A protein has these predicted regions:
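Short beta-strand to alpha-helix junction loop
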Residues: 72-90, 102, 186, 256-264, ...
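Short hydrophobic core segments
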Residues: 13, 133-146, 183-186, 328, ...
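Feature captures the FAD/FMN-dependent oxidoreductase FAD-binding
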Residues: 76-147, 322-323
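Beta1-alpha1 glycine-rich phosphate/pyrophosphate-binding loop at the start
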Residues: 8-12, 17-101, 210-211, 274-279
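Glycine/threonine-rich phosphate-binding loop and adjacent beta-strand/alpha-helix elements that clamp
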Residues: 44, 344-412
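Alpha/beta-hydrolase fold catalytic core
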Residues: 275-330, 334-337
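C-terminal active-site-capping segments
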Residues: 399, 403-484
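Rossmann-like dinucleotide-binding core of oxidoreductases
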Residues: 2-7, 11-13, 17, 22, ...
Length: 484
């Protein structure tokens, strides 16, 4: 979008799922406010525009991962990346959001002025290489939680000695020909289990090398109940029923994992044993932690297990001693020969797309701030952030956040306030890490993530029903949220 406008009521940063969802809530609930969306890339979609590796797909069902106001019409509920990208684009077009997006605009810094009660954004234009400035009363960060420029790769010994190709899935080489090649995928998360079946269709052998096992749940790629409802009900009604069905099921399953971890662990292992047998599962699918202590991976239609069963792929559970010319030497002295090594070793967590945050020309250390309802940060005025769930679809929480943000904006307008800022009670509320989650990328990031408190409204509960009443149906007024 080409515009000379340099001041807005609100600026949304990021044109992915959470950014488009925030824009919809904003223009529906606060129609008098003018806004723009700044997107650092040249296209809409966020994650789903960036990740293009073979087989990329959601690891959540699309009824909870997608927009509640835009029906998911595809019969596949565990959806392919290109279909998700088209869904985001179509939704943005349908609700006239696309025209509000300024592409190729990377926010370098955002500085709050207490005197002017406004944010000033310093923006890098990727096309002209020039620096632009925009002012706004409110800033809403929907830029995700990881570094788009590079993924995380551990410091593997002698990695440069390998004579073949090394690829991180975040930046896939589409010219890569892996036909009849030996491929080693390092990792056991969602990306690794997604890549394995699709690569095995052409490769000679695909080996998934994992340091330790992960919980994996087989799910049907199509939701039979949802597809039936689509045939007999209006699309939006069928979508809402299917969404609530899956929200409640996923929440019940998560709570069951927390309450009866041994029983649910046995249940998950037994489902895999039907395909791979006891010995294979006990060695490669027996995590040392409880179900949902880390994110549980979903695979559609048994594709991972069937590929292994058919001999086109294998799992090796060992640790790396060193890379060498032929591949990887394990600590057991076993050699894994490879033509291609894929480092599906995770993300680099990054807050606000690397943007510098300032208040009255002083840099704000985000790690010293506390998250208010997972929507705002303590002592940072007129600043909102989309923080999602780690135990469910990330975007479920982002949509509730957006609805609460619009409540705050309307409360400000009705009461003739211009500023809102959360103030943390250091004397009576204890500090905890923001995400009580043991995934590697979260543990690496704790040192620069904001904190949470040990009680409401400073505690992030990871519970949709609780957040529904707190955010969608809760009041904008709060003793810790100061309006001026």
């Amino acid at each position: 979008m080409k515009t000379k406008q340099s001041e807005f009521d609100i600026v949304i940063v990021g044109a992915g799922l959470s950014g488009i969802g925030a824009a919809y809530r904003l223009q529906n609930n606060c129609p008098t406010l003018n806004y723009t969306i700044l997107e650092g890339r040249s296209a809409i979609g966020g994650t789903w525009n960036l990740f293009t590796y073979p087989g990329v797909r959601s690891d959540s069902d699309m009824y909870t991962f997608g927009f509640p106001f835009s029906p998911w019409k595809n019969p596949k509920v565990i959806a392919d990346g290109p279909d998700i990208l088209n869904y985001i684009k179509d939704t943005a077009d349908k609700f006239d959001i696309t025209k509000k997006i300024q592409f190729d605009r990377r926010v370098i810094s955002s500085s709050w002025s207490s005197k002017n009660k406004k944010w000033t954004l310093k923006i890098g234009n990727n096309i002209t290489k020039s620096v632009e400035h925009i002012k706004c009363r409110f800033l809403y960060m929907c830029s995700g939680y990881y570094n788009y420029k590079e993924g995380y790769t551990p410091d593997f010994p002698n990695i440069d000695s390998f004579s073949g190709k090394i690829i991180h899935p975040q930046h896939w080489d589409h010219k890569l020909d892996y036909t009849n090649k030996k491929i080693v995928i390092i990792g056991s998360g969602a990306t690794a289990v997604t890549l394995l079946p699709i690569l095995a269709e052409k490769a000679k052998l695909v080996t998934m090398l994992q340091r330790s096992p992960t919980y994996i749940l087989n799910l049907p790629s199509e939701d039979v109940v949802a597809n039936f409802l689509k045939r007999i009900l209006p699309a939006i009604i069928a979508h809402r029923i299917s969404r609530w069905k899956n929200i409640l099921f996923n929440l019940a399953f998560y709570n069951a994992c927390q309450k009866w971890p041994k029983t649910l662990k046995k249940f998950l292992k037994n489902r895999i044993k039907k395909s791979l047998g006891n010995k294979y599962v006990d060695k490669h699918f027996d995590p040392k932690y409880g179900p949902w202590d880390q994110r549980l991976c979903a695979v559609p239609d048994n594709d991972l297990f069937e590929t292994i069963k058919n001999g086109k792929a294998e799992i090796v559970t060992e640790t790396i001693k060193t890379f060498n010319k032929k591949g990887i030497l394990l600590d057991s002295e076993k050699q894994l020969e490879a033509d291609i090594i894929i480092t599906a070793t995770g993300l680099k967590v990054q807050m606000f797309g690397g943007m510098e945050l300032l208040k009255d020309d002083k840099k704000i250390d985000v790690s010293n701030q506390h998250a208010f309802k997972g929507v705002m940060l303590s002592d940072v005025p007129n600043f909102f952030v989309a923080i999602g769930y780690t135990n469910a679809s990330w975007t479920l929480k982002c949509d509730l956040n957006a609805q609460y943000v619009t409540k705050i904006l309307n409360y400000l307008k009705i009461n003739n306030f211009t500023v809102c800022v959360p103030e943390f009670d250091h004397e009576n509320i204890k500090t905890e890490r923001l995400l009580n989650f043991d995934a590697g990328y979260i543990l690496r990031a704790n040192k620069f993530l904001p904190k949470q408190g040990d009680k409401s409204p400073w505690k992030v509960y990871q519970n949709y029903i609780r957040d529904l009443f707190s955010l969608k149906y809760g009041k904008a007024s709060n003793e810790y949220l100061k309006y001026k």
